[in-house]
Design a protein with these regions (language model features):
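Exposed boundary/loop context
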Residues: 1, 12-13, 34, 65, ...
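Short hydrophobic alpha-helical segments enriched in small aliphatic residues
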Residues: 2-7, 17, 27-29
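Short, positively charged and aromatic/hydrophobic N-terminal segments
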Residues: 9-12, 23, 28-33, 37-40, ...
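Class II aminoacyl-tRNA synthetase catalytic cores and aaRS-like
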Residues: 28, 41-506
Length: 506
């Protein structure tokens, strides 16, 4: 205030302050008064929100006899009479049954629509008929007062909240705020939050530092097309959204940061895939300085299994160390560079015994076989399996089987009969076995066989352990491959990797 003494002949004053002079205490009083005025509502139909005592998934038998205040959405009402009804109140945490026993509150409910926001003040009592399927199924609340905090204007909702997943996708997206009230939909967001929190805690526990890298950056080749953002002050120039924080984390390592991680957003302009959402996704991104492959493996073998065991469907994950499978072996035995090791089936090579059997698609091609022992599938199930394989891989699957007497039957068996002994010996077949086959160049035959393997494992009992997660590391990827669409040499994976020392001479 010293600089302003010449400009102001009088001190600050306030009509509400004693003597008109403004003191620190007066300032605080004025702030409190103004805050109080802010919370005064001028519209009578808007009611200020008061703190609830419990949420709708919280009350238990221990709360019987307590007066509580609940706030949530009006989900449903089962009307028994004009002065008796059973209301379901829902919030983020769950549902509570409200037993209305007064005509006044029943009339209030009849004047509002489902999904209106209401406040209930009432007393908790034990249910006479308990619901073991609900966390709050042992209690109910008898309301003494119901206050409508926000009316839903529509008599009919675009879909039933608890069945929103059955609605048209465009309708769900238009009314996403209603869709997210569905506990099944909401649970995915809750799960993601918990997984990310535990991942973050585990990485920090391993001395990693979380660092957020820039989103607007320059373009760098990562294997997909970039999303571009026009630079407003530089016409004709663009930022790129990062496909991965690769360059930034390498910069961090060079600058002396020893261990980095982030839950990184990645943007890739590519079509949707079975294992990847289009446009954007998030990944646990990490980098370690002065580390080798086994150092990285050791960290993740400690971080991942507990997360999957805690939040996964099966609650069991393979123990470290994980299997190490070379890329070529993975493609040869499993037809995939990310094999599902829960499936007991393996891919075998049948080129030598079947390429010249007289069946057109096999001629001059590689032939791969998947043998399912003691197979019990019906012809209808086999046809569906072949159709599913073609949808996923774009290639046909062929088959034959050995009946209980060891005779070839079904599918392309007539082309195999003359080579039966060689085929049985090469594939180790026995009576009751089923053989599914793929054909094409090496890569096509392998990938199609991989789809066959996964389809049989998932469709027929006895070939897949479905109650656990099986992890592995696929190592020794090739640096380049011929692109399926371009036909040109392309990176097989992210090129930002340490050199394999035995390849230095190349």
């Amino acid at each position: 205030f010293a600089k302003n003494e010449n400009k102001r002949s009088k001190p600050y004053s306030s009509p509400s302050a004693p003597g008109g002079l403004l003191t620190l205490k007066n300032v605080n009083d004025i702030i409190v008064t103004k805050k109080a005025r802010i919370y005064r509502w001028s519209r009578k139909d808007i009611i200020p929100m008061q703190g609830r005592t419990h949420n709708c998934g919280q009350l238990r038998l221990a709360n019987v006899g307590e007066e509580v205040k609940l706030v949530g959405w009006y989900e449903n009402l089962r009307k028994v009479s004009k002065n008796l009804g059973f209301l379901i109140l829902r919030d983020f945490y769950g549902t509570t049954q409200i037993v209305v026993e007064t005509e006044e509150i029943m009339e209030q409910l009849s004047s509002i629509n489902y999904e209106s926001t209401i406040e209930i003040i009432g007393t908790v009592r034990e249910r006479s008929s308990k619901n073991a399927n609900l966390p709050t199924g042992e209690i109910e609340v008898v309301p003494s007062k119901l206050t409508v905090l926000g009316k839903c204007r529509y008599n009919e909702l675009p879909f039933q909240i608890n069945h929103s997943k059955e609605a048209d996708e465009n309708v769900r997206l238009k009314y996403r705020y209603l869709d997210l009230r569905n506990p099944q939909v909401k649970s995915k967001i809750v799960l993601r939050s918990k997984v990310v929190a535990d991942l973050r805690a585990s990485m920090i526990g391993h001395d990693f530092m979380e660092i957020t890298t820039p989103i607007l950056t320059c373009s760098s080749p990562e294997g997909a097309r970039d999303y571009l953002v026009p630079a407003r002050n530089h016409p004709g120039k663009f930022y790129a959204l990062p496909q991965a924080p690769q360059q930034f984390k390498q910069l961090l390592m060079t600058s002396g940061i020893d261990r980095y991680f982030q839950i990184a957003p990645c943007f890739r302009d590519e079509d949707a895939r079975a294992d990847r959402s289009p446009g954007e996704f998030y990944q646990l991104d990490m980098e370690m300085a002065f580390a080798d492959q086994e150092d990285v493996f050791e960290i993740l073998e400690d971080v991942l299994p507990p997360i999957f065991a805690k939040y996964g469907i099966y609650h069991e994950a393979s123990k470290p160390p994980f299997k190490r499978i070379p890329y070529l072996e993975a493609m040869d035995k499993y037809g995939s560079d990310k094999p599902d090791l829960r499936i007991s089936l393996i891919v075998q090579d049948a080129t030598e015994v079947l390429a010249e059997c007289g069946f057109g698609p096999f001629a001059g091609n590689k032939v791969k076989a998947v043998v399912a022992e003691n197979f019990k599938g019906t012809r209808k199930q086999i046809d569906k399996m072949c159709a599913d394989v073609e949808v996923v891989s774009g290639q046909k699957a062929y088959w034959f089987r050995l009946d209980d007497k060891g005779e070839l039957t079904g599918g392309i068996s007539k082309f195999v009969v003359d080579h039966k002994d060689a085929v049985v010996s090469a594939l180790g077949l026995k009576a009751g076995d089923f053989v599914a086959l793929s054909a094409g160049d090496l890569k096509t035959a392998q990938k199609t066989a991989g789809v066959i393997r996964k389809t049989i494992g998932a469709s027929f009992e006895g070939y897949m352990k479905k109650d656990c997660y099986e992890f592995c590391w696929v190592v020794d990827f090739p640096m380049y491959e011929i692109g399926e669409e371009s036909g040109e040499l392309e990176f097989c994976h992210n090129p930002c990797r340490r050199v394999v020392y035995r390849h230095l001479r190349l």
